[in-house]
């Protein structure tokens, strides 16, 4: 096979209506030599579309029956089905299998334009085709396709089948051929914006296909075949080099038309990345290890490269003839040449005209791999990916507008020489030589085309240092690469690993928990359990309390193993007949209720890890795991080996102590690095105690709580976190008695959050006073029982609250004890606001006073969330920003936010300006657990929408 046929340049127009010769050939060009590739000629007529449905699609979906009949493994059964179909096609139709492959692998077909139809739009079209009333059950079934308890929930094509099978006039398969279906689909793609044309085409399909055929037609239009088979299943029986050619050309047509003889193999040159042939790029895998283990276990002390993970669009650049020809493709093989330019002289392109003089004049041709980003010339920063489309449209002569910039991290071809088999280290060295400007730190030209910098490292500490740097710069994450690896097209393996900040702060222990419930998924998982409810065992009992849901990290093999072990043991959740051994949260015991549940004794133990543990009223334990990930199925353990509530509490205390030790080590490093005389001096105020005093950490026992009984009902969240067990130990250390339940009127309930126990207590005992743990710290610091203040009350009677208010002035300043430094800052801040409030009463304050009929009152919108927002240097910002900042601060206060001045254990910081945001990100990067930095708009949008918005959506 001639090497001249490698790179595809352009294809002649296709006329699906006439089937003219123009659709039977296309040209490829290399070094000015044009070769025309002609489609093979079939000797038989186009078969019916039903042939694909009956002989391929349905057998692959109902694989278990085929496996049983053939007595083969599932992978062998898939290969058998595909090879038999291909063999039959070649014998009965001919060697041009492209018409069939377009329908079998619609997501790989670059020749057909997009339909512009997803599930929602397609559902509306079917409603019109079937002439359904909008409020009819079937119309609702199509629009609400993810809902319902039947098998079709989450599977749009199955939902369409249920609706269409009631109405279609055809009970047997239709007579439409493969060619006819392709022609109509081409027309549907051409009529992307013409709804009348779309309805006409779908109506034709409806009249000429039965419900099963229509189900598969829907999958083809959505380009989601849902038949549990990748392109490899079909490529292997077609030609031994089919996958290799597709990986370096991304062309289904070339695979079908060039590889018609399985005995003729590709040369090594033809299987290489080549000019103007879109290849499938290598992508980074998720790590199996933590940062510590990546350095130690994965690389075993060998060097590795650390790159910043760029927030952009993966792009490959092909250049030839010293810049006279360019071609650009995305990761999904979408052609962006018209957008970015086809030559250095292309005035309409948004990038190539700016590349003149950047690429070394000795470079005749090259293929580069990188990330296309949006660049702001004013700030000289890369800005969020969502702005890239706007940057592409901006007028290039306006220097103040955002523009696309190409961040290059790999080179795969240089002056006709493929480099994919060279090591990454060799490719990196080559990459630096192809750009004319290498006289400063930036290789390439800033704002136009740059080579992505990298750091060579060998230790986990270097990974953590880089991670903290990208947190400070509000970047996306890191990519860690093996410098000895070759480039592997269309591969995701551990030679490239991607890490995000969340992966760095895992809850340090593996947890063995029991699955107690399951949830059905959507899409591919519509008919199977895609996530599981896990629980902790109540000590000395066979009851399990709900703890968290997990779905991440499970492979197809894991799902299958769990299904095998639990088959036939699942039961539908019945709110009127709840299980005795599976307990959920909520007054009615139905929060986070699963679709199905299982007796713990019939279930399995799974090993999970998570980013952190957070308080949650949604789960019976009162806590849940943040970002849990499945690690392993523990078939060596039974339900009795599952983690108990008390075991988890002990484990959590150990983890917290390790985190505190790590923080102390970090502080020691900072002090050592600061040098003598560099530490900031502490200001001591009259009637103000230190922050250390506030924490009540004095090791000297006292008898301050002698003859006093407490029942601790939750962890302490402010002024710092302390577990329930730690609070109980603190009480005992200072002479108090601890009960696990409220034993009569002389037992003081203590809690910082409204857990299930607190809610049950307030329902059972009207007007009960629930004291916050900060009162315990006040008493220990003063070495006596101090008067209650409003800040000490979680729940109270009107009388207790009125009495507590008499112990502070109108600004919250205590009459009975010295304030801590933090409290004094809060009082001063409130006093400043008090004068402003008298003259400019904001609408938001009045809004808080109104009755809220939503699920979450605005008075609790930010409840429990630790937020930092400074009002210093307000006179240096614009007047409008000042008003917005004060309004945002009031929203946080009235919404129950825990406003703090210390960055320790912070969750989110609100910045007024970009300069402040930059400084906050720097501080965040130095914390053991980094916090999020958001703009004022995060507060405004959360308040307006009545829900706390995702912080990552509001950067500054």
From Swiss-Prot:
GO BP of this protein: DNA biosynthetic process; DNA recombination; double-strand break repair via classical nonhomologous end joining; double-strand break repair via nonhomologous end joining; nucleotide-excision repair, DNA gap filling
Cofactor annotation: Mg(2+)
Cysteine pairs bridged by disulfides in the record: none
GO molecular function: ATP binding; DNA binding; DNA ligase (ATP) activity; metal ion binding
Keyword Metal-binding: yes
Keyword annotations from UniProtKB, A to Z: ATP-binding, DNA damage, DNA recombination, DNA repair, Ligase, Magnesium, Metal-binding, Nucleotide-binding, Nucleus, Repeat
Keyword Ligase: yes
Ligand binding (Mg(2+) 2): 476
Active site: 309
Protein name: DNA ligase 4
Organism whose genome encodes this protein: Yarrowia lipolytica (strain CLIB 122 / E 150)
The gene coding this protein: LIG4
């Amino acid at each position: 096979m001639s090497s001249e046929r490698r790179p595809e340049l352009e294809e002649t127009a296709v006329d699906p209506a006439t089937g003219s010769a123009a659709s039977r050939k296309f040209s490829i060009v290399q070094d000015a030599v044009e070769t025309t590739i002609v489609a093979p000629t079939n000797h038989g007529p186009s078969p019916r579309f039903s042939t694909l449905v009956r002989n391929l699609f349905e057998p692959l979906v109902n694989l278990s029956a085929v496996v049983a009949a053939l007595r083969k493994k599932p992978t062998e059964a898939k290969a058998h089905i595909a090879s038999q179909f291909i063999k039959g096609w070649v014998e009965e139709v001919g060697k041009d299998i492209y018409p069939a492959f377009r329908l079998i692998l619609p997501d790989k077909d670059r020749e057909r334009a997009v339909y512009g139809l997803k599930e929602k739009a397609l559902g509306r079209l079917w409603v019109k085709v079937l002439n359904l009333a909008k409020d009819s059950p079937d119309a609702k079934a199509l629009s609400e396709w993810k809902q319902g308890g039947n098998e079709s929930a989450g599977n749009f094509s199955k939902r369409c089948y249920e609706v269409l099978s009631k109405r279609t006039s055809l009970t047997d398969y239709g007579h439409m051929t493969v060619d006819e279906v392709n022609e109509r689909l081409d027309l549907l793609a051409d009529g992307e914006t013409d709804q009348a044309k779309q309805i006409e085409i779908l109506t034709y399909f409806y009249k000429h296909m039965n419900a099963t055929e229509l189900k598969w037609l829907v999958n083809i239009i959505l380009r989601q075949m849902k038949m549990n088979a990748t392109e490899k299943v079909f490529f292997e029986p077609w030609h031994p080099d089919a996958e290799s050619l597709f990986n370096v050309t991304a062309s289904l047509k070339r695979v079908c038309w060039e590889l018609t003889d399985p005995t003729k193999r590709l040369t090594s040159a033809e299987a290489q990345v080549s000019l103007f042939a879109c290849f499938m790029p290598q992508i980074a895998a998720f790590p199996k290890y933590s940062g510590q283990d990546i350095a130690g276990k994965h690389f075993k002390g060998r060097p590795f490269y650390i790159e910043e993970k760029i927030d952009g669009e993966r792009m490959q650049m092909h250049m030839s003839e010293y810049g006279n020809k360019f071609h650009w493709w995305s990761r999904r093989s979408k052609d962006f040449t018209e957008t970015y330019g086809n030559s250095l002289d292309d005035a309409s392109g948004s990038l190539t005209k700016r590349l003149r003089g950047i690429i070394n004049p000795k470079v005749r041709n090259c293929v580069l791999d990188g990330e296309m980003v949006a660049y702001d010339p004013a700030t000289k920063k890369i800005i969020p990916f969502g702005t890239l489309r706007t940057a592409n449209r901006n007028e290039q002569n306006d220097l103040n507008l955002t523009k696309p910039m190409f961040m290059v991290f790999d080179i795969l071809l240089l002056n006709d020489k493929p480099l994919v088999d060279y090591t990454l280290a060799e490719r990196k060295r080559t990459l630096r030589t192809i750009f004319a400007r290498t006289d400063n730190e930036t290789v390439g030209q800033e704002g136009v085309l740059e080579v992505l910098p990298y750091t060579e490292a060998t230790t986990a500490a270097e990974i953590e240092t880089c991670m903290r740097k990208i947190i400070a710069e509000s970047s996306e994450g890191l990519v860690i690469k093996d410098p000895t690896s070759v480039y592997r097209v269309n591969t995701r393996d551990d030679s490239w690993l991607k890490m995000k900040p969340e992966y760095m702060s895992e809850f340090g222990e593996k947890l063995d928990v029991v699955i107690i419930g399951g949830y059905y998924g959507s899409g591919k998982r519509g008919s199977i359990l895609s996530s599981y409810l896990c629980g902790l065992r109540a000590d000395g009992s066979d009851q399990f309390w709900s703890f968290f849901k997990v779905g991440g990290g499970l492979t197809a093999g894991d799902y299958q193993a769990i299904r095998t072990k639990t088959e036939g043991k699942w039961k539908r959740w019945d709110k009127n007949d709840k299980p005795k051994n599976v307990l959920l949260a909520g007054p009615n015991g139905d929060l986070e209720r699963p679709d199905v549940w299982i007796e713990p004794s019939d279930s399995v133990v799974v090993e999970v890890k998570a980013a952190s543990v957070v308080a949650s009223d949604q789960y019976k334990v009162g806590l849940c795991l943040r970002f849990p990930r499945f690690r392993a199925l523990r078939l060596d353990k039974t339900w009795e080996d599952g983690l108990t509530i008390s075991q988890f509490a002990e484990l959590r205390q150990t983890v917290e102590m390790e985190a505190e030790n790590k923080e102390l080590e970090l502080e020691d490093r900072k002090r050592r690095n600061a040098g003598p005389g560099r530490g900031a001096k502490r200001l001591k105020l009259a009637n103000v105690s230190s922050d250390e005093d506030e924490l009540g950490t004095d090791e000297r026992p006292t008898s301050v709580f002698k003859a006093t009984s407490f029942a601790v009902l939750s962890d302490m969240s402010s002024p710092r976190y302390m577990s329930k067990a730690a609070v109980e130990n603190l009480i005992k250390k200072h002479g108090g008695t601890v009960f696990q339940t409220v034993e009569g009127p002389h037992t003081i309930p203590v809690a910082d959050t409204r857990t299930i126990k607190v809610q049950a207590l307030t329902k059972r005992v009207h007007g009960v006073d629930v004291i916050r743990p900060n009162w315990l710290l006040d008493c220990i610091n003063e070495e006596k029982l101090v008067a209650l203040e409003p800040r000490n009350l979680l729940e109270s009677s009107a009388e207790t609250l009125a009495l507590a208010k008499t112990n502070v002035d109108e600004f919250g300043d205590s009459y009975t004890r010295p304030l801590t430094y933090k409290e004094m800052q809060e009082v001063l801040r409130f006093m400043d606001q008090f004068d402003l409030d008298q003259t400019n009463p904001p609408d938001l304050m009045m809004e808080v006073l109104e009755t809220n009929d939503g699920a979450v009152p605005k008075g609790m919108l930010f409840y429990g969330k630790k937020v930092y927002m400074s009002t210093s240097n307000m006179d240096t910002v614009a007047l409008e920003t000042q008003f917005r900042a004060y309004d945002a601060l009031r929203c946080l206060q009235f919404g129950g936010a825990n406003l703090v001045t210390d960055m320790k254990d912070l969750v989110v910081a609100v910045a007024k300006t970009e300069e402040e945001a930059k400084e906050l990100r720097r501080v965040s990067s130095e914390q053991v657990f980094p916090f999020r930095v958001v703009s004022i708009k995060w507060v405004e949008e959360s308040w307006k929408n009545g829900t706390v918005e995702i912080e990552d959506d509001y950067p500054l």
